[in-house]
Amino acid sequence: MASVNQTVQLDLANQSVREVNQFLHQDFDDGNAHYIEILHPDGNHSIGVGLDADADIDIRGHAGYYVAGMNRQARVTIHGNVGWSVAENIMSGSVRVKGNASQCAAASGHGGLVVIEGDASSRCGISMKGVDIVVGGSVGHLSGFMAQAGRMVICGDADAGLGDSIYEAVIYVAGKIHGLGADARKEPMSAEDVAAVTELLEQAQLQHDPQKFKRIASARTLYHWNADVEQEY
Amino acid sequence: MCGIVGLLLKTEPLRERLGELMVPMFTCMAARGSDSGGCAFFGESGDSPWRRFNLYVSDRQYPWQTLLDDFKTEFDGKNGSDVRFQTLENHAVLTAANDPVVVREWFEQRDPKVHLMSVGRNMDVYKDVGDPVEICKRFRFAEATGSHCVGHTRMATESAVTPVHSHPYTAGEDFCLVHNGSLSNPYMLRRRLEREGIRFETDNDTEAACRFIEWRLREGDNLQAALTTAFTQLDGFYTLLMATSNRICLVRDAFACKPAVVAETDEYVAISSEFRSLAHLPGVAQAEIFEPKPEEIYSWRV
């Protein structure tokens, strides 16, 4: 049973990212609830990469590239904007960005939940493999490129090339779609889809009407090579 | 990697603080490129009769006075020119009304070690190899005033690390360009431009992009037309940030793999490779923040 809160403050003004990450890599599996606050991230790269801990982590400020990459279990909140590849290859747990995210948010994520409260840039959810992503704002071009599994909810608009070469992941978009990628198509929303969007918006704590979302999924025409199609190179 | 920064100030009071505001942007991006650093500053626009010639030598104890005395003897009084100059270690700004072609030739003959980095009525260019933070201190970027600037921190991935290979690149007058990325057809562009009689100073890919775009502008294209042509002719990865005496302009290639983020308020437009270098700017929390789209032209007037 979880006992007393173990609150720890780490300050990147006095410690290196490597020192902070080494602290975060210790064995937290002691039955206690852990709360860790990281101060002065100042856009440093690779903060909190490789976490595998039942812990709540608040990063107070802007983070750089790869923050919370490969996350397991931990619930990480970044109180600012993040650079490229936040929560890249996330396995489980959750990562929440209070501001905007740059390119490749949650790239190749296997599980867990990634919430971007602001906008995400291009290639959001590229090659996602089971992670759930909720973006409060809009996403940039080529989001969901080769997305294999998992769900992505976009409350704003999506730029060109959405879901290009998508496999079995599903994308839900409330706003305008500025062009679908190859083999991505709009499909009717089923009751299960509305339930999925409702559940994900609840988890993300974002208020939107689930009925307004469109479903984008694979037309599966790229699954097999079609020699009859006219090829020009 | 490389770092690029740009800042355009929309209000007069802020223009007194151009250097002060850009220095943290620039030094932050030194982490993306530690080979070389440089910045082009644009002072108050307006039609000055004088051209500003920015000169560079690698020797920090260079006897500028002798050179400039000779220049005065040669040019003072000609074409109504009233030659003035200011020097700062291995950099000098010479103000004169003479023809840039004649001036360039004179310097080449007088001392080939002296490199004419830029010509323009509003633009000063400072660049060198070495730690960008040191370059920034040596050339007193913090004291700069003016309407806009573009800077670059370089981590070379193709041509040599020398002062002339560092950014910003300039071509023509009052035009400069910084680049993050790499072009795959710079020699094709270069051969094309050399047939037009355009001379190159380095074997660097960015110089090809810089001279190509300036050539299109000089041939009468507006910015839109010049850059639309550039999209079809430049092959490779690029985020390009350009400046003229009255605007800055930003474009990314079709894949937009090279980073750029823009923060715009009523008071300024700030551009950087990474958001963290904009985080100190006043009112940035309320700024409109976005990443530019591929092959879209973003241009801001002073």
Give names to the regions the model predicted.
Chain B
Residues 1-302:
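Conserved short alpha-helical segments that host acidic/polar catalytic motifs at enzyme active sites
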